[in-house]
Amino acid sequence: MTVYESLMIMINFGGLILNTVLLIFNIMMIVTSSQKKK
């Protein structure tokens, strides 16, 4: 495995973690907004 390939894997893995964090953040925002409406 070259340095470039390992770097690309690191970037892809970091993007996956970032997407997961954003997804959880969006779900939390929806839950809090729905609780305020009640």
UniProtKB/Swiss-Prot annotation:
Keyword Ribosomal protein: no
Pfam family, one: Hol_Tox
Keyword Ribosomal protein: no
Top-rank taxon, per record: Bacteria
Consequence of gene loss (knockout): Non-essential, it can be deleted. The gene for the antisense antitoxin SR4 RNA cannot be deleted.
Role played: Toxic component of a type I toxin-antitoxin (TA) system; expression in the absence of cognate antisense antitoxin SR4 RNA leads to cell lysis. Induced expression causes membrane invaginations that dislocate the cell wall synthesis machinery, leading to eventual death. Unlike many type I TA systems it does not form pores. Base pairing occurs between the 3' UTRs of bsrG mRNA and SR4 RNA, which leads to initiation of degradation by RNase III (rnc) followed by the action of RNase Y (rny) and RNase R (rnr). Not toxic when expressed in E.coli.
Protein name as it appears in the record: Small toxic protein BsrG
Annotated organism of origin: Bacillus subtilis (strain 168)
Gene: bsrG
